[in-house]
């Protein structure tokens, strides 16, 4: 099971660019399917959120090896898709995410630092 991911969050489409938003979303889904088939990522899942008064309307969580995801994140195709998404949806962003066993590691380090500093 992957212990690292990319959280790719997005807000609502820019008014008047809804069709382009659908187009770029579909391009991204095709890209992630291809990455998964090639073994470059373990899995991905897209989520649409219910309206809640906030800016985040959905996200895609891409799971995989940290080094592979770092290469993907700086690849020409990922950068191109990110630029396209940023032009048609509000609040687009990509954030690295610790998953699985890395959560335990992060909590251990955090607790050690709390003990040292308090």
Residue ranges and their predicted role:
Residues 1-55, 64-74, 94-118:
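Short S/T/G/P-rich N-terminal loop/turn motif that feeds into the first structured element of a domain
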Residues 58-88:
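Mid-chain, well-packed structural core segment of small domains
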Residues 90-92:
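Low-complexity RS/RG/RGG-rich segments used by eukaryotic RNA-binding proteins and nuclear co-regulators
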């Amino acid at each position: 099971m992957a212990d690292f991911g990319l959280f790719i969050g997005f807000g609502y489409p820019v008014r008047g660019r809804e069709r382009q938003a659908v187009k770029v979303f579909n391009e991204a889904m095709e890209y992630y399917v291809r990455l998964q088939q090639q073994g470059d990522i373990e899995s991905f899942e897209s989520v649409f959120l219910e309206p809640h008064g906030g800016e985040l309307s959905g996200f895609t969580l891409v799971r995989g090896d940290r080094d592979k995801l770092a290469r993907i994140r700086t690849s020409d195709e990922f950068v191109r898709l990110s630029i396209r998404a940023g032009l048609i949806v509000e609040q687009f962003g990509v954030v690295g995410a610790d998953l699985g066993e890395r959560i335990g590691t992060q909590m251990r380090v955090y607790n050690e630092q709390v003990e040292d500093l308090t």
